[in-house]
A protein has these predicted regions:
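Membrane-associated alpha-helical segments
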Residues: 120-207
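Short charge-dense sequence patches
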Residues: 47-63, 77-96, 118-134
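Generic structural signal for short, flexible, solvent-exposed coil/loop and linker residues
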Residues: 18, 25-27, 77-82, 88, ...
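Cytosolic regulatory modules rich in charged/polar residues
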Residues: 83, 87-97, 101, 105-127, ...
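A short, ordered amphipathic alpha-helix with a cationic face
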Residues: 75, 99-101, 136
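A generic short alpha-helical patch detector that favors 3-5-residue windows
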Residues: 77-80, 102, 172-175
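Helix-boundary and N-terminal cytosolic regulatory elements
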Residues: 1-83, 106, 142-160
């Protein structure tokens, strides 16, 4: 169970409306009076796991998180509502740049293999990586919109810093997406060249 420090007191983060998580397909927040509600769709960094989902409810007195998949492994602290949600979102993306750098290294290895004409299964590798990159690109776009709304709700300049971090992550995924397209085209060119060579060989044999 995770706990939150809020207004100097340790508070239990309760599970709320767990069934509604099944309907989460994107990230968004909504504020009505002093009550903030949010739902979040988080792509997985692991091949063996699907996307993860959680929801929050936050007001001047309570900070409630529905997190049945245990996304948050650490305490979430804050002396006011905006600090709670700000720290929560920073936890969400704290390892993302390192994850994206590892994706780039994988793409570079694929490029090296393509250049040296060694290895196989390029198409499936590139396809899986493009799916991952696309999922994170969409996620960051949604999170940027969420942070812009939070900045409007709470008028806290710390959200501007968080938005800049998300924009940098989004820019990286855009670059990786373009890189993966180039690798796919390189692979397709090699496939077509091999097919042409085979056809030329068959033509010579049959004449």
């Amino acid at each position: 169970m995770v706990y939150s420090f809020f207004k100097g007191e340790i508070m239990r983060i309760e599970v709320i409306n767990e069934k509604r998580l099944n309907h989460i397909h994107y990230c968004r927040v909504h504020k009505e009076n002093q009550q903030l509600s949010g739902s979040f769709w988080v792509p997985s960094k692991s091949k063996s796991k699907n996307k993860k989902m959680f929801s929050i409810e936050l007001n001047d007195r309570n900070f409630l998180v529905c997190d049945p998949e245990h996304i948050f492994k650490q305490k979430i602290s804050g002396n006011k509502p905006s600090e709670c949600i700000l720290n929560l979102m920073n936890i969400l993306i704290q390892e993302d740049m390192e994850f994206l750098q590892k994706l780039e290294m994988k793409l570079e290895r694929i490029e090296d293999q393509l250049m040296s004409h060694t290895g196989s299964h390029y198409e499936s590798q590139i396809f899986e990586m493009r799916k991952t990159i696309s999922a994170f690109d969409s996620y960051y776009d949604q999170m940027i919109e969420v942070v812009q709304n939070l900045q409007e709700f709470y008028n806290d300049t710390h959200f501007e810093t968080l938005e800049k971090r998300l924009i940098r992550l989004s820019n990286v995924t855009d670059r990786l997406a373009e890189y993966s397209i180039q690798l796919r085209e390189m692979h397709q060119t090699q496939v077509e060249m091999r097919q042409n060579q085979i056809m030329q060989f068959l033509t010579i044999v049959t004449t």
